[in-house]
Amino acid sequence: MALLQIAEPGQSPQPHQRRLAVGIDLGTTNSLVATLRSGLAESLKDTEGETILPSAVRYLPDGRVEVGRAAKAAAAVDPLNTVLSVKRLMGRGIADVKLLGEQLPYRFAEGESHMPFIETVQGPKSPVEVSAEILRVLRRRAEEALGGELVGAVITVPAYFDEAQRQATKDAARLAGLDVLRLLNEPTAAAVAYGLDRGAEGVVAIYDLGGGTFDISILRLTRGVFEVLATGGDSALGGDDFDHAIANWIVEQAGLSADLDPGVQRHLLQLACAAKEALSDSGSVALAYGPWQGELSRERFEALIEPLVARSLKACRRALRDAGIEPQEIAAVVMVGGSTRVPRVRRAAAELFDRQPLTDIDPDQVVAIGAALQADTLAGNGRDGEELLLLDVNPLSLGLETMGRLMEKVIPRNTTLPVARAQEFTTYKDGQTAMLIHVLQGERELVKDCRSLARFELRGIPPMVAGAAKIRVTFQVDADGLLNVSARELGSGIEASVQVKPSYGLTDGEIARMLKDSFEYAGGDKAARALREQQVEAQRLLEAVQAALEADGEALLSPAERAAIEAQMQALRGVLDGPDAAVIETHVRHLTQVTDAFAARRLDASVKAALSGRRLNEIEE
């Protein structure tokens, strides 16, 4: 919905002038910028007539920065100063990046908060700075083509990008001088590009295989409303991996050493990429590297990439299961990303969903076009009846740590965004005046199996008995998937909050691993959670009974009664660290039974003390 525009006194609001906004597909391999002109979405071309900008940045000794084709062409001769596929590094930590070492021929330095910096002749550069160079070129291209300054841009991101990766994308845009109208999930943008919002109803699958990431989204379309039923994918699967599969095959066939210098790696990857593209139209391609010559057939290529294609299909099946949808219920399959030009990929999607996928729009441009349509609406240019409602979801559950190091989910995964959820918690010990809020992301039951996002403290809680204080913790996730968490003690009104901005993102495949583990270990996790909960309950009971004995044991219990209680306490302590929740529960019940009479006497004594010295009419009043 457009904001109301109020003109300055004496000035015309000029309603006929369109506000200039663009959609940007910031891709792993290539990037594009698109806009709406005369009611039609189009990708904007550079001065050489090219729409695609290779996502390549080269830093030169004289201080200049090359972006695009020139940088990509120099990758083999200047690999250490030429950054490709920087999207893989966005929002990641230095430890995550080292896991990709063999695929990334750069020299890395560790910055603040474990941020990875790429060493170049112009000094260390962060992934955010590199991405900003790409966005800066796209912004200039758009402003030159449109003849004015942009009011903002919709930038697309993989549906599986977590908070750190999304925030890194926003930071890069800010460095490039762009106002981000919204971050839009790439699969959702593709659905917009195909016009599926106009009158179409049903369930659609968006199969998005780009250069470095794979996303599958299951969307329900109802009267122009997009609802994402489920998302899935792999944050480290794409066309780059196809290139590496071919390059490794060449190394093996040519008898090359596995320890190759960066320049050779770059050259082999360029050779592999050209072969991959040729095999989309030809049955075989001739290859040569140094003295070695060979031929790669399409059949052999498909065998090399079959494990990668299978990974994408596995994610598709998981997303269908999450959405509660059978493959035959899918009304349309939209193919997105340059890697979907590979015939084996198209066949695999057709076989899984039992229908031919939609490939009418250039798969390299479809995401940028969808983003441009959404940007035009958000900029206030939408015509009556053409507003678009996009409901995205969070890819993993969000929650916090409770006693016993348990994960309490506050916002389950696949919850429609934006969303705000609140849950009330209480103190564990008498007189507790502070609470540590530990924010987590993941699907498992125990804290150790989930990812830590942030920690903050709520201080100044009025001292009271355990369980009396009420602390409301509110999770808010905006339309871009960014999280804010606040905690408020309801009695005193004290409050603390944190914007979750972790310094790096998930490791390769970590989201997929989290989901996989949540299914595989569901039974064991529930048993472990039950054990922890029983241990927490037992510990709480032991502390309460011990405090009661110290306060009133001598006055209200006979020596035999006290001995019986202490014996049962000792028995409970003996099984407290054991593996059987049922055994602990039995001992808790026994201790409760043996202390029932003691609890009743303490209550009577408290009532007598409260009424002592008061007249009947005072009590009645």
Curated annotation (Swiss-Prot):
Entry's family note: Belongs to the heat shock protein 70 family.
Function of the molecule: Chaperone involved in the maturation of iron-sulfur cluster-containing proteins. Has a low intrinsic ATPase activity which is markedly stimulated by HscB.
Source superkingdom: Bacteria
Record's keyword terms, sorted: ATP-binding, Chaperone, Nucleotide-binding
GO BP annotations, alphabetical order: iron-sulfur cluster assembly
Taxonomic source organism: Azotobacter vinelandii (strain DJ / ATCC BAA-1303)
Gene: hscA
Matching Gene3D superfamilies: 1.20.1270.10, 3.30.420.40, Actin, Chain A, domain 4 (3.90.640.10), Substrate Binding Domain Of DNAk, Chain A, domain 1 (2.60.34.10)
Protein name: Chaperone protein HscA homolog
HAMAP family named in the record: HscA (MF_00679)
Entry-linked Pfam families: HSP70
An annotated Gene Ontology molecular function: ATP hydrolysis activity
